[in-house]
Every structure is written in C-alpha cells, then in structure tokens.
Amino acid sequence: MNKQEWIDKCNHWKTKWPVMQKEYEADDSDTPLNLYAVLDAVNKYSGRDDIIMGDAGSISYAGPVALNRKYDQRFVFSPAQADMGWAVPASIGVALSSNDKNVIAITGDGSFMSNVQELSVIRHHCLNIKILILNNRGYLSIKNTQEKYFENRVYGTSDKTGLEFPVFSKLAESFSIPYYLIKNKGDYENGVFYGLDRLQHIFAIEGPVIVNCICLENQEILPSQALKNGKQAGLHDMAPFLSDEELQEEMVVTL
C-alpha cells in the first residue's frame, strides 16, 4: 500500500465511522449536552487561526479525534502528563505570545478548579481567552476508572460522593469576566438564546469569557479500548466493537 492508498483508506474510515453522530446533536429536551456536540460547535465557529488548548480528562481523549484543525489553527494539549488544570495557565502563555490571537481553552469543571486563581492574571491583562468548561458535575474520567476497575466503588467524584463545586457565574462575576451558560439547543433565559450556536457570538468577543457548558454526567468516550470476552482488545479492535467479518474486511493486514 502506497501513501495515497493509505490516505484514501483513512478517508474511507472517517466517512464510514464519523466521530459526530446524529444522536449526539443538541435538541429541545432537558438532556445535557453531549461532549461531541460541543466539540462539533467549536469546529463550526472557531476562527481559521484560533489556538485551541485541551486539558486533561475528557477533552484529552475526545479532542484529538473530534476537533478538525483547519487552516492555521493549532491544538495544544498535554497528553503525556495529563495534568488536571493545565489548559488555563497554559493558555495565558499562549495568549501572551501569539499576537492577540483567539485562544480557546477547553477544560472540565474539575480541571478548571485546579488553577482557578489564574483568572486574576487573565483579567488583569485582558487576555483574549475563551474558557469552555465541559461541566459534567464532577471528575468523569476518575469516576469511569472507579466504575470499571474498582467494582463500582465510586468516591469523591461528584456532589453525590463528596465533591462540591462553586457557582461558576458568581466566580466569573468576582473576576469581572463575562459569563455564558449553554445547556441545550432550546434553552432560553430571560429571552436570550443560550444554545451552542451562541459560540459564534462568544468567539467574536474581544477579551476573556467563561462559558459553562452543561454536559452529560455519564458521557461515553468512543472509540475506546475495552474488555472483550474478558481480555483487553488491541488498538485495531476498539469499542463499540465491529463484527469479526467487518473487522476482517476493513483491515489492511491479515489478522
């Protein structure tokens, strides 16, 4: 297989198994936002030379596959260290050295709290940073680990198991940073629309903004490695699993 054949094969897989599925789209229900719908909106409304920062947790798994880097965009994250709270302080350095480009820092509610003091630096320098909080009301990655590998003994990962978060709107107000709440497609508050399409307006604002995206508490990160018949499957065979026939058909080498 030559280079072009490999590229064609990869594009075939991207078309056959798109990351963004129809059922992930926001709707008029009370269901929280799907993480992939939020990232799809970032793809749609981010600028051609925006710099996107990814924190640890859900965004570090979903971001590399769901974000479609375009034109001169950059996606910067720290997967090797996976340190919670990295995105906000890192975005400060990027903003100060990028000639006032728009910086989009995507973080979880747990990671955001790890370096919340950096908001004072962002406000003081009026940095052009948009902080998107993927608010799943806790430590989703830690909770998933506890459920999968510790027989569902979950502790310290949500308000139900000993973890509390502040009211983010009041936190933003205390730093004099504009705040937006995004719940679902049909959400209105005081006559103002707060759906994901609101990101088009938010990304055009000069200066810092905090955006609180209310997301699913039990978000599945797909595709992912999982136990298959009691054994860890390989990177070529990830959940949701294909049939043996389809897997063999799509492989470029013989199993």
Regions inferred by a protein language model and the residue ranges of each:
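A diffuse structural propensity rather than consistent per-protein peaks
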Residues: W6, T31-N34, V167, N184
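A general, composition-driven signal for non-globular sequence regions
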Residues: D8, T15, V19-K22, L119, ...
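Charged, low-complexity surface segments at secondary-structure and domain boundaries
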Residues: M1, E23-D27, S176-P178
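Terminal amphipathic helices with adjacent charged low-complexity linkers/tails
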Residues: M1-K9
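Thiamine diphosphate
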Residues: I51, Y61-L255
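Active-site diphosphate/adenylate-binding microenvironment
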Residues: H12-V88, V94
